Amino acid sequence: MVKVKQSEINIGMVGHVDHGKTSLTRQLTGTWTDTHSEELKRGISIRLGYADCEIMKCPKCGAPEAYSVSKTCPVCGTKTKMSRKISFVDAPGHETLMATMLSGASLMNGAILVIAATEKCPQPQTKEHLMALDALGIENIIIVQNKIDLVDEERAKESYNEIKEFVKDTVAEKAPIIPISAHHGANIDILLNAIEDLMPTPEMDEGAPARLYVARSFDINKPGCEISKLKGGVIGGSIIQGTLNSGEKIEIKPGLKIVEGNKIRWESIITKITSLGVGGKTVKVAHPGGLVGIGTELDPALTKSDSLSGCVAGAPGTLPETLSEITVQTKLLDRIVGSDEELIISPLKSNEALMLNVGTATTVGIITSARGDMADMKLKLPICADKGDRIAMSRRIGSRWRLIGYGIIQ
């Protein structure tokens, strides 16, 4: 079996719709990650796009020209060496897909905020995505000023000043602003250099019991497949600690919904790992970082159409409890961003329904009691989470869910 290098860090590609996130991901990875949106019965679910990128460095040239994604140096033609392998999570920029962006953010160790120079900054989702990074505690940020090939020098400078003004007093205040053209590949070397300098590989605890956030799940069998050739269901996600080995057993929580009369309970699923896939290659052991596909012995009917996304998987008996009620310490934003008018955020009140994102899970919490900055909530769909985990909270305003702050599970 070939030794496959796994991605060491997950970087989110965030920003307003049509500002060039997917084009930039394609320029860096060669993969068009466009995501299919489909509204599933558990609220809105649109797939995140994922792609791996190998950052290559020329041993002869100096930085930033030394960095590229090519096997030979574009400047001098020397054979390049791999500096690091990284994974991009391409989050949707459309306002209705905020829930997906938030569930993708739990997989991100850093983010590239893409802002087009062709439009006034900030656009609604540019603001909302930056607030989300802040709420979820993502501090390693690089700002990319895209589409500089479509504006003159005067507008490029004006756009730069708008961005500077916009990020003042936010988590991205000190982030570098790199002007690029994703379409023509201009300044990609400078961006890669910045990623290497400013986004260190996070320290993951490989000795801890394995834990993985499930972001996707599917049935890989084609219709009409012979029974003897059927393959078990596949789950995909990111390992946040520990390692997974082919042949091991894993537990998936909250797992299966079981209805008995008028009672509903959730039962965790235990299955065996039949295969592990990383970057399109099969491996025996999967480590934290990047995205891992896990073949299992599960009935594919249980995994089709992302039905297990939002679950947590790991070594049996080591996962947190499945919670259907939680107490959170909340921190609300000052105002709602992402829409044309910015409304002041009123305090939480009893019986209010909030959309909650924790890990890759999305659920609705009904507030049973709100006092000061503490709130008790009953969850429509249970979650598997630990004390101290961060939850992004959104409130329904008009026909949209809008981010209003975050909470820490008590």
Curated annotation (Swiss-Prot):
Family the UniProt entry places it in: Belongs to the TRAFAC class translation factor GTPase superfamily. Classic translation factor GTPase family. EIF2G subfamily.
Entry binding sites for GTP: D18, H19, G20, K21, T22, S23, N146, K147, I148, D149, S181, A182, H183
Region (G3): 90-93
Positions with a binding annotation for Mg(2+) 1: T22, S45
Descriptive protein name: Translation initiation factor 2 subunit gamma
Stretch list, region G4: 146-149
Source organism of the structure: Methanococcus aeolicus (strain ATCC BAA-1280 / DSM 17508 / OCM 812 / Nankai-3)
Cofactor annotation: Mg(2+)
Signal sequence interval, chain numbering: none
Segments of this protein annotated with the region G2: 43-47
One Gene Ontology molecular-function label: metal ion binding
Residue numbers binding Zn(2+): C58, C61, C73, C76
NCBIfam families in the cross-refs: eif2g_arch, PRK04000.1, small_GTP
Enzyme class: hydrolase
Chain spans, region G1: 15-22
Binding site for Mg(2+) 2: D18, G43
Gene Ontology annotations of biological process type: formation of translation preinitiation complex
Family matches, as Pfam families: eIF2_C, GTP_EFTU
Region of interest (G5), residue spans: 181-183
Highest taxon of source: Archaea
Catalytic activity: GTP + H2O = GDP + phosphate + H(+)
